[in-house]
């Protein structure tokens, strides 16, 4: 059977918002997570509170392009 075009799920990247603006952090770099999202149910960009290893605390991670 042939597949129907693009599926509803796609892989997205979540990036820490405080890593870019805060020079006083534990280590250099920007923390990123990858996850999947259903574009039919969640049309807006995701914002999740996750642990950032560079800031060493829970911060808001936003979906990137």
From Swiss-Prot:
SUPFAM superfamilies recorded: Zn-binding ribosomal proteins
One Gene Ontology cellular component: ribosome
GO MF annotation list: structural constituent of ribosome
InterPro entries attached to this UniProt entry: Ribosomal_bL33, Ribosomal_bL33_CS, Ribosomal_bL33_sf, Ribosomal_zn-bd
Biological processes per GO annotation: translation
Keywords: Ribonucleoprotein, Ribosomal protein
Highest rank taxon of the organism: Bacteria
NCBIfam families, per database record: PRK00504.1 (NF001764), PRK00595.1 (NF001860), rpmG_bact (TIGR01023)
PANTHER family documented for this protein: 50S RIBOSOMAL PROTEIN L33, CHLOROPLASTIC, LARGE RIBOSOMAL SUBUNIT PROTEIN BL33C
Protein family membership: Belongs to the bacterial ribosomal protein bL33 family.
HAMAP family per UniProt: Ribosomal_bL33
Protein name: Large ribosomal subunit protein bL33
Native source species: Synechocystis sp. (strain ATCC 27184 / PCC 6803 / Kazusa)
């Amino acid at each position: 059977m042939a597949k129907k075009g693009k599926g509803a799920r796609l892989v997205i990247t979540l990036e820490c918002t405080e890593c870019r603006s805060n020079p006083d952090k534990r280590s250099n770099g920007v923390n990123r997570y990858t996850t999947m999202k259903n574009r039919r149910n969640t049309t807006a960009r995701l914002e999740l509170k996750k642990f950032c290893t560079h800031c060493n605390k829970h911060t808001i991670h936003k979906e990137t392009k």
